[in-house]
A protein has these predicted regions:
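Active-site glycine-centered loops adjacent to acidic/histidine catalytic or metal-binding residues
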Residues: 91, 117, 291
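Short, charged low-complexity linear segments at domain edges
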Residues: 124-140
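Short beta-strand segments
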Residues: 47-51, 113-119, 123-125
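ATP-binding/phosphotransfer module of carbohydrate and carboxylate kinases, centering on a glycine-rich
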Residues: 1-45, 55-58, 76-86, 101-110, ...
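Generic enzyme active-site microenvironment
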Residues: 89, 97
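Short hydrophobic alpha-helix segments
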Residues: 11-13, 65, 134
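A short acidic/small-residue loop/turn micro-motif
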Residues: 14-17, 69, 138-140
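A charged helix-plus-loop insertion that forms the helical arch/lid used to bind
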Residues: 59-70
């Protein structure tokens, strides 16, 4: 990545099933990109966005829910193979930093980034610094409990934010409408062919075409997102809130109900300055750009 946030060269490889092979895959990608680049390509370090709890040292993944990593010294493992400095950061934190530096938050020094995808993630930039907490695991906003004794979450708790305000929740609720033989679900069933084949992209696509049920489903998710970020804003008081992730591809179909619920549920909203809500600007590249910039600048 260039210093202005441009991705100069890109490549990809599937994540191996065996977590012990990930360092080798990263090293292979680095070597391949170096081979593709010009002779004067200057690479100062490697940034890795990892979906999990990353220790304050930005080197060790303490736990990853979808990869068999526990106390994984990822920076050391990759560094031994590529002979370059390595910085590891939580993937949502990296995306937040990317949006702050080069995207939706580049005109502020105070940003709350919320990613609404399969789950809910986030990152906090305060006074131009990425807020990581005392142990490196701050901003796990998807596990803010919003419904006491609510739906069981993969983290082991019940009622977490992401159980109601995520792509997973959107699909679950859409399938429930199909299984209940709701007549409004017929257009979605015709697209999917089967309730189990429903995806968030299908729901969003039909919502864009004006399908009433799919518009309602996105409105429900937006309502939950808005209520959740109102609670977060009461604690963090951000200037800008950027919303990204796959569900955010729905644009105003999601953002309008988010904004309404946010303003309705923000404590004492009529007596305070209210954060500006924006759609994230960098899409799926936010984490790549943020991780690379953290490796370059240290964040």
């Amino acid at each position: 990545m260039a210093s202005d946030g441009r991705i100069v060269l890109a490549d990809s490889e599937p994540t191996p099933g065996d977590a012990t092979g990930i360092a080798a895959v990263v090293a292979t990608l680095v070597e391949r990109i170096l081979e593709q680049g010009p002779d004067n390509l200057d690479v100062g370090g490697i940034g890795i966005g990892a979906a999990g709890f990353v220790d304050v040292d930005r080197a060790t993944v303490r736990f990853a829910p979808n990869i068999d990593w526990i106390d994984e010294p990822l920076a050391e493992a990759v560094g031994k193979l590529v002979d370059l400095p390595v910085v590891v950061e939580n993937d949502a934190n990296a995306a937040a930093w990317g949006e702050y530096r080069f995207g939706a938050g580049e005109d502020t020094d105070d940003l709350l980034f919320v990613t609404v995808g399969t789950g809910v993630g986030g990152g906090i930039v305060h006074r131009g610094m990425l807020f990581r907490g005392g142990f490196g695991a701050a901003a796990e906003i998807g596990h803010l409990r919003v419904v006491p004794d609510g739906r069981l979450c993969g983290c082991g708790q019940r009622g977490c934010f992401e159980q109601y305000a995520s792509g997973r929740a959107l699909v679950r609720d859409a399938r429930a409408r199909v299984e209940s033989d709701d007549p409004q679900a017929q257009p979605l069933l015709m697209v999917a062919g089967d309730g189990e084949a429903i995806t968030g992209q299908m729901v969003t696509g039909l919502a864009r075409q004006g399908d009433p049920m799919c518009v309602d489903l996105l409105r429900d998710v937006g309502q939950w997102v808005g209520e959740g970020i109102a609670t977060l804003a009461a604690v963090l008081d951000p200037r800008v809130i950027a919303i990204g992730g796959g569900v955010a591809d729905a644009g105003d179909l999601l953002l309008d109900p988010v904004r309404r619920a946010f303003e309705e549920h923000l404590p004492a909203g009529e007596h305070r300055r209210i954060a500006e809500l924006r759609l994230a600007a960098l899409g799926n590249e936010a984490g790549i750009i943020g991780a690379a910039d953290l490796a370059r600048t240290g964040g």
